[in-house]
């Protein structure tokens, strides 16, 4: 089964919580609660409702950026973007038990995050995406192939999740580059039935 990380997104039809609930219902086992414009209090309110839902489905829950909150709420970990707290600092604060993921766009990013102790890397974007502002250069299939080859050559063994503007039809070709999983948001939420779409994607 595909290793799928669902990244929450608020749309006209769905709240952050509802988007995560549908992904869980469809069988997704890894949720990243991402609420970029929200205050820590707003994130905490949603996380407190989402945590038991994830637990009931035996799914991993990580927060985007909010390291202190992740520690306070005892979720499974955090995902840190390029402008968030440095991974090394987060590791000191959280200890070894928490999952820490980092965003990477180049092999240089990969080396830095690996050295800092990241548990996995979200590498992207695959293509242009409307869910993220200040987008890094688009990688495409060639970008993943190149970065993974350099990782292999350098002996860097760390799980890679492809992220950024990915739709279901892209998944087979992206997985062939050697990545370990896929992160999705819009591809699921824009489907007529997000629960069924999650199930379908997990079986690609």
Curated annotation (Swiss-Prot):
Sites where the protein binds Mg(2+): 65, 84
Entry keyword annotation includes ATP-binding: no
EC number: 2.5.1.3
Pathway: Cofactor biosynthesis; thiamine diphosphate biosynthesis; thiamine phosphate from 4-amino-2-methyl-5-diphosphomethylpyrimidine and 4-methyl-5-(2-phosphoethyl)-thiazole: step 1/1
HAMAP family listed in its UniProt record: TMP_synthase
Family (UniProt): Belongs to the thiamine-phosphate synthase family.
PANTHER family cross-referenced by the UniProt entry: THIAMINE-PHOSPHATE PYROPHOSPHORYLASE, THIAMINE-PHOSPHATE SYNTHASE
Name the UniProt record assigns to this protein: Thiamine-phosphate synthase
The organism's taxonomic lineage, starting at the top: Bacteria, Pseudomonadati, Bacteroidota, Bacteroidia, Bacteroidales
């Amino acid at each position: 089964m595909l290793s799928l990380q669902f990244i929450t997104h608020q749309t006209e039809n769905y709240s952050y919580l509802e988007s995560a609930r549908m992904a869980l219902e469809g069988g997704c086992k890894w949720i990243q609660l991402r609420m970029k414009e929200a205050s820590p209090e707003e994130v905490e309110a949603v996380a407190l409702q989402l945590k038991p839902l994830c637990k009931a489905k035996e799914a991993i829950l990580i927060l985007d950026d909010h390291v202190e909150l992740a520690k306070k709420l005892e979720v499974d970990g955090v995902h840190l973007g390029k402008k968030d707290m440095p991974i090394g600092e987060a590791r000191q604060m959280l200890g070894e038990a928490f999952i820490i993921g980092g965003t990477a766009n180049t092999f240089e990013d990969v080396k830095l995050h690996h050295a800092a102790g990241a548990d996995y890397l979200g590498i992207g974007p695959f293509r242009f995406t409307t869910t993220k502002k200040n987008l890094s250069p688009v990688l495409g299939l060639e970008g993943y192939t190149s970065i993974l080859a350099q990782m292999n050559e350098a002996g860097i063994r760390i799980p890679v999740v492809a992220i950024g503007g990915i739709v279901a039809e892209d998944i087979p070709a992206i997985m062939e580059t050697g990545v370990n999983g896929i992160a999705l948001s819009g591809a699921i939420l824009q489907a007529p039935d997000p629960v069924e779409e999650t199930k379908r994607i997990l079986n690609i």
